[in-house]
Each structure stands twice: as C-alpha cells, then as structure tokens.
Regions:
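Accessory beta->alpha helical hairpin/"wing" motif in late/C-terminal subdomains of nucleic-acid enzymes
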Residues: 1-31
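C-terminal accessory/interaction regions of large nucleic acid-associated machines
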Residues: 20, 25-180
Length: 180
C-alpha cells in the first residue's frame, strides 16, 4: 500500500483522505494542520457567512481529488462532514480555555463548541495512537497531536458525586399486579 493508503486506513470514511492530502502538500505547515483537523467534523455550523468548503484543508483535498464525489468518503472533493471555521474556534479555545463563550453567537452554541472540541481531541487521539510510518510529516503530526492531547482537558470530564446506597443495589424491574 501507498503512504496515502496507510494513512487512510487509520480513519473511517473520508477523514483519512483529507489527512493524507494535507500531509502530501509539503507547503502545508503541520502546526496549522493540527487545528484544521477540527474542520473535518464542523459541518455548516462554524462557517457563518463564509464558504463552508473554504480553508487550507479543503484546498489540499481539491488539489488532490478534484470535485470527486464518492458516497460516504468525499463530497465534491472533501469529506462529507467538512466545514470551514472550526479551526479558529478550536485554536482560540486551546490557547485560552476561558474564551469559549466569546465564540458563541446566534448560529453557534456552547454545545457546538464542546462537541467540536471533543471530536477534534478524538481525531488527535486517533492520530497519536496510530501506527508509525516512515514519513517525517506523519511523525511530526503524531508528535504534535500527542502533545496537545496530553496538555488539554476534555470538556466532558466531570467530577461525579458518589452513588447513594440505594443506587448500588440490584434493581428489580418486575411489575407486580394485585387481584382484588
């Protein structure tokens, strides 16, 4: 298999095609790509009035795949859930976690931001735990992804209270009917 094929095998659907396209573009800085990966799951929510298909990652995809549509993998040359704009939000929140609410507007809610951060961290985790390849750009992306995953906290981590005693007992879901 080619390096592109190996990278694609680490992901489901079209995300691997986009990552491979970005890595093959030698002029695409890895430190920008790591944030642009958030666009893979952004859909239309983050672009506002801008072009949903904009951005450096979409440009790399179009350069390599043209406007091909392959159901489930590419839609006009980019992954189907792609949407420009999430990279700015993710980079901003990564640099200053308290700035999350500054990004909230009539189209973009706090839940959307939490979701994209969760998806982005998941993609970075996938990259950091994937197999090593003899490709310096892939190795650099894995290194940066690992560093970011280890230094950031998931927005879903919550300290839960201890269980009540009644919650630790087995639940009996039988319905008992009485006859009169």
């Amino acid at each position: 298999p080619t390096l592109r094929g190996k990278v694609c095998s680490f992901f489901s659907q079209g995300d691997g095609l986009a990552v491979a396209a970005a890595l093959e573009d030698e002029s695409y800085p890895i430190d920008e790509l790591v944030y642009d990966l958030a666009d893979l799951d952004a859909s239309f929510r983050f672009c506002g009035e801008d072009n949903r298909w904009g951005g450096r990652l979409a440009t790399a995809c179009h350069k390599l795949y043209g406007n091909q549509t392959i159901p489930g993998y590419l839609e006009n040359g980019v992954p189907p859930k792609y949407g420009f704009g999430a990279e700015q939000v993710v980079a901003g929140v990564h640099k200053n976690p308290l700035s999350k609410h500054a990004w909230v507007n009539e189209l973009l809610g706090a839940g959307d931001i939490d979701r994209i951060i969760i998806e982005w961290r998941s993609t970075l985790r996938q990259i950091s735990h994937a197999a090593e390849l003899d490709w310096p750009r892939w190795t650099a992306l894995q290194t940066i992804a690992s560093e970011i995953v280890n230094e950031t906290e998931s927005p879903t981590i919550t300290e839960l209270p201890p269980l009540e005693y009644s919650q630790t007992k087995r639940v009996d879901h039988r319905l008992i009917l009485r006859r009169h």
